[in-house]
Structures are given as C-alpha cells and as structure tokens.
Amino acid sequence: MMLSHWVLLLSLGAVWLAEGGEISPGSCTFENSTCAYTSAFPFLQWTVNIEGHYVSVDSSNGLRGQKAVLISPDLHLAEWSCLRLVYQIAGSESSPSPSSLNVFVRPEGESFDYLLWSAEEHSDSWLISSIDLKNTTKRFKIILEGVLGENTMSSIAIFEVKMTTGYCIECDFEENHLCGYMNSWNPNVNWFVGGGNVKNSHSILPRDHTLNNELGHYMYVDSVYVKHFQEVAQLVSPLIITPISGCLSFYYQLQRETSNIFLVHTRDLHGSYDEIWKMGAVRQGEWNLAEVDLNAHVPLEVIFEVAFNGIQAGYVALDDILFSPVSCSGQEGMFFDAREAGCDFEEGMCQFHQDDNNGSGWSRVKVKPNAYQMGDHTTGLGYFMIANTRFTGQPAYFGRLYGPSLPGNIQYCIRFFYSLYGFYKTIDSLAVYIFEENHVVQEKIWSAHETPKGVWLQAEISIHKPMPFKVVFVSWCKSLWDCGIAALDDISVSIGSCKISDRIPPLPGKCTFEKNDCGFEQEWQRRGIWHRIQGRTPTFYTGPNGDHTSGVGYYMYIEATNMVFGQKAKLISRPLRAVAGKQCLTFYYHMYGAGTGLLNVYLTKEGDINKDTLLWTRKGEQSITWLKAQMEYESEQQHKIVFEAVRGISIRSDIAIDDILFQNGPCNDSSDPLQSSGYSDNFNNIEF
C-alpha cells in the first residue's frame, strides 16, 4: 500500500447500509447500477453484480496491467468532507505483480489526476478506507481505478463509496462502519461497541453521550478480559492523509480512575509514537470532555490506548470524537510553513546568515560554467553559496552558515545539494551541525566524504529536537593542502521524516526517471534511441557526470556514438488532456560537447499529426552543467509533448534531459535565462 494504514475488516453483512432518502453527490451503494459514475473508454468495464451490492472486475475480463476506471460526476465541496470506500482485492498474496485499487482526484481544468490513496493488500473480507477531501471552489471528479495483477484469479470489488461532510477522524459510532476505527488486535482485551441494547459486557455500562439514551452507541473496553498486568487495548483511527491542524476533542467515561491508564498517541508511517494526551483526575461515572491540540503535518493515525492493572479495573468508554481547525486555546490552527526555512539563493540569502565574529567564510556567487566548474543547481546560471575559495579559505578556518530558527518537538527533513571540487583534499570540508539556542555546544549530524567531483549531490537528514534549533552548514579549511572547495544550493525543509516524505505520492505531472520512463514512448523506425542511464555517459568530454535530481539517479540521453550526423531521436509523452488556458512545461537539459547538435520541443495536437508546433529549441554546446528550460503553451485538444534530439557532427554530441514537470496555469517565471548559445557577462570570477 502506498500509504499503508490499519483498515477495518468487515463481513459483508456488517458494512453500513445506505440511509433512506437522497444519496449525497459522489456516493454510491451499487445496488443495481453505478449511480452517476461512468466507465471510461477504452478501459475495462466495471460489472455490477447480478444480485447488486457491489461492482467488480476480474482476470476473466482482462489481462495483467489492464485497468478498469470509474469516473464520478462533477463534484463541488463547500465544506471539508470525508470519502469512505469499502473494497476488496482478491488473488495470490505472493504474486510479484499484485492487483491494486487507486483513488484519484481530477481538478477541473488540469491535465493530470492526483493520487489520493492506493492499496494492494489482499483480503478475504471487505476493507474500509477513509480519505479526507479539502473544501475547494474548483469543481473536480473522483476517479476509481482498478489495475489487474498477473494472478489468474485476480479480482477487485467496490461495495460502496460514501461522501460525508466533516473530517474522517470524527465519529459518534452510530453507524456500523465505525468511521474506519479498528482494534490493534489483542487476543484478550479489545474495544467493543456499546449501547444500542447490546448486552455483551459483565459491567454496568452507561448511556451514550451522543443521544443520551440506551439506543445510542459508543466504544468501550472492559477490564474483565485482562489476562496480564497492564494489558493494553488500542483503538486506531483512520490514517490522516491530508494535513490538518487544530483541536481534537472527545468524551470519555471510566468506572475506576485509579486502576487504569488512558492515553492518546499519534503514530506515523514509520511507526514512531508520540503521546499527546494522558488522563488526569476526573469524575467517575460521568462523561468527561477532553481536548488536545493535534498537528498532523504528515500522514499519521490517532490511537486511543487503555492499560488495566487488573480484572477489577472496570471499564473505559469513548464517544463523540470531533475535530476543529481552531486550536483548543481558541486560536486558528497554524502550520509552521517549513518551506520558508529553505533557500535557493536566487534572490538573496533568505533567512540564512553568517557568524559576524568569524567573517565571511561563505560567499553568494554566480559563476560562468566551464570545463572545471559548474553553474548552480537551481537553473544552471543562477546563484549558490561557496566556501574555501582562494579569497575565503584560510588554514584552520571555519565558515559557518546559519539557517533560521526551527520550532522544537517537530520532525523535520532537511534536504540540500552540495558539490566538492578543486585540486585539494575535500574530505570533511563540509559538515552540518545542530545549534540549540539554549546550548553553547553544537552537535555534528552530517559530513561530506570523498565524493565524485563535477556533480551536484543531494543529501537529506531527518532531525527531531525537543527545543528550537538552527541548522548550521560548516566549511572547514584544515590547511593549505587540505582545503577542498565546498558549494551549497537549494536547501529545503519539510515536516516529517525523510523516509516518510519519500512515500508520499509525487506530483502527477512530474518525471525524474528514477523508477521508469514515466510512460514516455519512442519512435523506433529509422530513429535514434533515448537511453535511461545512471552516472556519466560512456564518451569523454560530452554528456553529464550525473543526473539533476540527486546526482546519483537516472536521466534520459542520446548516445551519439550509435547515431550518424543528423539522425533524430524522439521521446513522446503520453496523451495529455485538453484544457483551456496556459500550461507550463519545465525541464532540465544538458548539452555539452564540441559536436553537439540540436534539442527541440514540439507540441503535437490530436488530429494534427503533420502540424507539430515548435515550442523551444537549442543548438550546439550550451554548458557543462544542467540548465533549466521553462515555457508556456496552450492546447484545447488532446495533445502530446515531443522531445527531439538531433545528433551533431561528432561523437561528442550526447544530449540529456531530466526532471520534466507539467503544471496547470502560466509559469511563475517564464523567462529563459539562456536565450541562445553563449552567456551574459553578469558572472562572478572566482579563483579556485
């Protein structure tokens, strides 16, 4: 599962029944039809079961990799809503290519669908998943996509889709689906549904809080089933996928205060727990209100946990879980915008500064790329930070670059690009320290070791500190012969562990070529071929030393030694939906080599096969570094984007592209820093 989480195992009879009256937009019980959902051509058809109740697709209808797609009608959310899906995926669990079920959102006027949720886990029972949807002024559609695996017995079924107003974490436990809450299984002690004239407890249970009568429902856990000291029962919420910040409130009741422990934790995708609430002194036999601030910056679950000291500890009951975007203190729930803590140094040093007592060990520069030095990582021709040059590097000299203060008790992921080069040693010439503002001592958390020169490498560090702190980038010039040059660019800060953020779905229009070719196709007949490669190209004095994404990843390039002068290679995007208004295309290209030919970008509209529109072109050697290209185009027809590379006069004609990004709307900065071959004179002259 892309965003793995606990799900509630349901038998078919335990799944909630649609309430009488009108079904809310986006909901469907699949009794005798797919409601307002429609199947998308030319994909497989979802089949309504002959007895109703669900739709399905299986291996008898199609082959491995084939899709069945259901598209909702146009939807509009004036309020925050929750989409709940009851589904089942059947087949062999050992299959190397299992079936999957995906949920996308398709915003009006955009070419791409955004992945909200995905599952591959097989089950003999129905499962339930909950997905938070932000309120929006833009219309959208929900896309349900089933992808068949290679097993001959593969099948995917959807029992019900239900759209309700409110947050998925909220619950009054009055419906059979229990809002997706489930037990973290314990063979002895578990949470049960109470109320509704249910008589399955040895204790005398209370009325519920919602209705205040015997017909209402709530969750409870009873100590009578305890077999071991402080045995734990956990009730786990649906996974919170969409970031929220505010006040979580709930009502609870207990029979004996001194004989049990009641806690609330959060748990992220990495399995890390964080206690956010603990029961104090309360009135027994009454419903008590609890409130706690909840900041779900990354996907996480909320866990209600009870530990009993013995079988005579009574019960703990839980009801009416609510969430408000206003903090419990009454202030609007505020996110710390981690993006503001980063910097690409294009417009200045952002919130970074140097230690005035030590002088300026770091310099913000823009250099002219040549065979010995690269441009910056952001655009290839922009600004970056550099240390240990002839003018800043002195024996036994430290240069410290301080970042902004970051609030404590939050998990962060720090990413940045660095490059070490020069003719001197580079080991330990760049390090990262943590400076806690209430401590004098700095803690070293990362250092650069001997790395390939002539390439920007990405580093990432996960940090969690209880108190506010600053990240410090330290350059060290040990001696005249051990003073490697250190460069730094594109520092970014995000909430959550770096491992967790890697599991969050990427932007749908983004392709880094790290895993595959992103659906790009090639023209094979009498054409050259684009190759997906990692590292440097085989021919010297042409091509990049590494990719643009991380420095050690993949990119696409043409190998000039396998082509003849003037031969072309075309890389063609998958069909893109027609949308009104401007679209923005961004990518990075590398054209280095004395014999470099041409790189062209075309727009091909459906039905206009012979009328390609040239959007952008470059001819000849451009730079030893990756350069950024950005352009706008419009197409109210289905279309494709074509990258065409033309081999130059010699084998030193490798051309590469990487990090392609399609975005809706005009480009934020549509100006291309390099309008033709050659450079401007607005560069710093740096001696190394």
Swiss-Prot record:
Is Metal-binding one of the keywords?
no
Q: Where in the cell is it found?
A: Membrane; Secreted, Extracellular space
Signal sequence region: 1-20
Please give, as recorded in its UniProt entry, the membrane topology of this protein: Peripheral membrane protein
UniProt xrefs under SUPFAM superfamilies = Concanavalin A-like lectins/glucanases
Query: Which Pfam families does UniProt cross-reference here?
Result: MAM
Q: Which residues are glycosylated?
A: 32, 135, 358, 668
User: Record keywords: Heme included?
Assistant: no
What this protein is called in its record is Thyroid hormone-induced protein B
